[in-house]
Amino acid sequence: MPPAGPRGTAPLAAVVLLVLGAPLALASEDCLWYLDRNGSWHPGFDCEFFTFCCGTCYQRYCCRDLTLLITERQQKHCLAFSPKTIAGIASAVILFVAVVATTICCFLCSCCYLYRRRQQLQSTFEGQEIPMTGIPMQPVYQYPPDPKAGPAPPQPGFMYPPSGPAPQYPLYPAGPPIYNPAAPPPYMPPQPSYPGA
């Protein structure tokens, strides 16, 4: 066996430093959030330098005892969902899907109703033709024209000037109404055409 020199002690020193330095490397490890046995939520917290997270899945604290150490990987494993959490998430997902499905159904039903109504309205006018002829209408005078003013200039859209005001016809005869007391009533009931009826 060759004599142990400076080369032989180097690997041994590295192993010793690793074993003794492991707790120091693990020190200052944070405790993640957790739920205790009652289901109460506790926020995560930082441990001071040269201490690390200790305890169980349901209770955590900072310490220097390596036997009580709970690694970050073990802490994340503790975060596995409980049956209550899974049931809550499942019911929330089902409720969300139900709301979305109901909204989509209501939207589609209203669209179908409006489409059918439009089709019915179009089918009623399908065979009818509405003549669209451009018959010019005479302009309506707001005030009677002054006979001293002369003929009015032609209106835009009309070829000829208006011929003047329409003649006024009397709707009722001039003077007091004619009343004849001996005249028969305006409506006479029909007389029976055969006797005894």
From Swiss-Prot:
Organism domain of life: Eukaryota
Membrane topology classification: Single-pass type I membrane protein
TM regions (residue ranges): 88-108
Protein's cellular compartments: Membrane
Gene Ontology cellular-component annotations: membrane
Extracellular side: 28-87
Statement: the UniProt record of this protein carries the keyword Membrane: yes
Signal peptide positions (record): 1-27
Pfam families for the chain: Shisa_N (PF13908)
Keyword Transmembrane helix in record: yes
Predominant localisation class: membrane
Record topological domains on the Cytoplasmic side: 109-197
Keywords assigned by UniProt, alphabetized: Membrane, Signal, Transmembrane, Transmembrane helix
Entry similarity comment: Belongs to the shisa family.
Protein name: Protein shisa-4
Organism: Mus musculus (Mouse)
Lineage: Eukaryota, Metazoa, Chordata, Craniata, Vertebrata
